Amino acid sequence: MIKKRNTTKISVIGAGSVGATTAYALMLSGVATEIVLVDVNKAKTEGEAMDLSHGADFVKPVNILSGDYKDTEGSDIVVITAGAAQKVGETRLQLINKNINIFKSIIPEVVKYNKDAILLVVSNPVDVLSYVTYKLSGFPKERVIGSGTVLDTSRLKHEIGKRYKIDPRNVNTYIMGEHGDSEIATWSVTNIQNIKIDEYANKENLEYNDNFRKEVYENVKNAAYEVINRKGATFYAIALAVTRIVKAILGDEKTILPVSTLVENYYGIKDVYLGMPCIVGGSGIEKALSIDLNKTEASKLVKSAETLKNTLNNASGL
């Protein structure tokens, strides 16, 4: 449980596009009194910290530092964004061997100085690396969280909201499973302010059929690739997603977010990290919710879990 105190310290490991933008989003949110940036590129890390610090007059009081792992000591949350970036045409799972080796050097250092912190993994492939972090850290599963499908779920809400011309915040739904190509859309539980989506579409004379679901799902699944093809990387939306998770933890909100967590017995799925609706609060993941899926969705979720397990089993360096 995050202890209530006058200061809140968040460390961000990795000061690339995602890490630096996450630090910026955290700074704007006002949730932290201290943010520490750590990266192998010392000069860039110092530059990012300087640039952020120069905006201190425009936000709540916050101390932005660059440093090494010792400077992260006593962090409430350690956000891990370090790793090889996803290139054009490269899947998240193809990043695995590069990033496992990076994590084998990062996690022991993080744990050395932060025995009581919550670890929030963002680097891709996030589900696999969350599992790797869980194993390397020795932390309880509640305190090792992956950003999971929080961003994918936001993308799904955006797509539905755009097509139906409604506020995406009024769309209740989840993307579950891998944060990647095998993720699933939970159409069977999707609703618009507690009205089932098929009923809402019928009442409002809107499209909702197999073609609609396929188009929306493909747009969500391929969203990162489309952004990467155009600008080289995704970082704004994931930074906002990470900030949302951090706020839920620090505020002990007990809100439901589809983060990546260790699944132990859900439709026969065990010993793998997957994006699942979870109650997120001061102790991290307080409970994973076993929502009822239809047969097709459950089957796809099992396949998603198998994909991730096979990737772990085939990865080098584990």
Swiss-Prot record:
Location in the cell: Cytoplasm
Reaction catalysis annotation: (S)-lactate + NAD(+) = pyruvate + NADH + H(+)
GO molecular-function terms, A-Z: L-lactate dehydrogenase activity
Swiss-Prot/TrEMBL keywords: Cytoplasm, NAD, Oxidoreductase, Phosphoprotein
Pathway: Fermentation; pyruvate fermentation to lactate; (S)-lactate from pyruvate: step 1/1
Residues noted as binding NAD(+) in the record, renumbered to the chain: V18, D39, K44, Y69, G83, A84, S105, V122, S123, N124, S147
Classification via InterPro entries: L-lactate/malate_DH, L-lactate_DH, L-lactate_DH_AS, Lactate/malate_DH_C, Lactate/malate_DH_N, Lactate_DH/Glyco_Ohase_4_C, NAD(P)-bd_dom_sf
A GO biological-process term: glycolytic process
Residue numbers binding substrate: Q86, R92, N124, P125, V126, D127, D152, T153, S154, R155, T234
Highest taxon above the source species: Bacteria
Keyword Oxidoreductase: yes
EC number: 1.1.1.27
Active-site positions on this chain: H179 (proton acceptor)
Phosphotyrosine modification, residue list: Y225
Stored HAMAP family: Lactate_dehydrog (MF_00488)
Family affiliation: Belongs to the LDH/MDH superfamily. LDH family.
Purpose: Catalyzes the conversion of lactate to pyruvate.
Subunit and interaction comment: Homotetramer.
Protein name: L-lactate dehydrogenase
Organism for this UniProt entry: Clostridium botulinum (strain Okra / Type B1)
Gene: ldh
